[in-house]
Amino acid sequence: MSRIGKRPVTVPSGIEVSLDGTTLVAKKGNLEKRLETHGRVGINIDGSEVTFTRVGDEKQDAAFWGTYRALFNNIMVGLDKGYSKSLEINGVGYRAAVEGKTLKLQLGFSHDVNFEIPEGLDIKVDKNIITVSGTDKQAVGQAAAEIRAYRPPEPYKGKGVKYTDEVIIRKAGKAAGK
């Protein structure tokens, strides 16, 4: 029995939810998010609550039940409040700037790294802090991970791009010789 799947998802005010075949559609203003369930779960929309039910008794059906409920809850939170991730740049000469739809990073390479900002995401830069925000949890996390991957933090001086809440375990340098 999925403990996540059996909990109902509350729909915040201002968001309309409808069912289009096996696709759940959530609208807030001109934003629209769709979740295709492929008929793997039963869906019941009751006012401001959406409940999911298992279709079969297979082990895989229970997994899909909890997964689709969690994905739909992420859509509700994204449309209501949005998601954001913060990254911190550490290092001499390391900089970031937004130019149009491109994030320009100077990370100690012989060239600048240009990161194309994906559709639906917003990136802000304040000194050495990069904030990635948007309504799609997966897209926000993916973009933040791609930016971090250009220059992950190294354990000796901590130079690189890291999440603001990430703890870098530091290593001691080489011991001095005789």
Curated annotation (Swiss-Prot):
Function: This protein binds to the 23S rRNA, and is important in its secondary structure. It is located near the subunit interface in the base of the L7/L12 stalk, and near the tRNA binding site of the peptidyltransferase center.
Similarity comment: Belongs to the universal ribosomal protein uL6 family.
Keyword RNA-binding: yes
Signal peptide extent: none
Domain of life: Bacteria
Quaternary assembly: Part of the 50S ribosomal subunit.
Descriptive protein name: Large ribosomal subunit protein uL6
